Regions:
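Histidine/acidic residue-rich metal-binding segments in metalloenzymes
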Residues: 11, 33-41, 63-180
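Metal-associated gating/positioning segment near the N- to mid-region
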Residues: 1-31
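Alpha-helix capping at helix-to-loop junctions
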Residues: 16-23, 43-44, 54-57, 72-75
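Active-site mouth loops of central-metabolism enzymes
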Residues: 1-8, 54-59, 81, 86
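Glycine-rich, histidine-containing beta strand-loop boundary motifs that form or position
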Residues: 29-30, 49, 113
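Acidic, His- and aromatic-enriched active-site or binding-groove loops in soluble protein domains
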Residues: 44-56, 108-110, 134
């Protein structure tokens, strides 16, 4: 796909949503490719700019990139906030930067949550498909990672600002104990 194709696909999706009666969208994104469509759209958008950075050494760079993307939306008067991608893809230092920013901006927070058995295994024992993907497929050093022995949600809630609205996506493996 080239940029022109991507723009056409984004515009087409926007039109289909409007025709289907959708008037408000929370869009999880990690780029500014949708800005032009959002500026012309009749739909109200809030863009959740995802930040990724599993290794602590990447926190500053990952956060700066997310702020850069968010600024492109802000400069065009489009609503957006910087958010963590998922519990397994964000280091503690990156969570802290995102939380400080969310508190300062009084922004919405959104995060993919408990979407696979592999995510649960990663947090409880440090094994599973997420662990394999991070170390073998992505080639990221996981030596700093220490499993918490708890669910991913319980493990990261302490890094999310308590007073900011929180939207969690998926929740396929969320248990009653996580909610309690």
């Amino acid at each position: 796909l080239d940029f022109g194709d991507t723009e056409k696909i984004i515009h087409s999706a926007d039109r289909k949503m409007w025709v289907a009666g959708i008037s408000v969208v929370g869009d999880i994104s990690n780029s500014a490719l949708s800005i032009e469509t959002k500026l012309r759209s009749r739909i109200y958008y809030h863009t959740f700019v995802e930040s990724f950075g599993f290794h602590p050494s990447r926190a500053e760079r990952a956060f700066d990139y997310a702020l850069f993307v968010q600024q492109q939306f802000t400069n065009r008067n489009l609503q957006s906030s910087v958010v963590p991608h998922a519990p397994y893809s964000v280091s503690q230092p990156l969570f802290e930067k995102i939380a400080q920013n969310a508190i300062q901006e009084n922004s919405l927070v959104c995060m993919h949550n408990q979407e696979s058995k592999g995510e649960a295994e990663f947090f409880t024992s440090g094994t599973g498909t997420i662990a394999t993907h991070i170390s073998e497929n992505l080639g990221i050093d996981t030596s700093h990672w220490k499993p918490t022995g708890q669910s991913s949600l319980v493990s990261v809630l302490k890094y999310l600002p308590a007073k900011n609205p929180l939207l969690m996506v998926h929740n396929t493996f969320t248990t009653q104990a996580d909610i309690d």
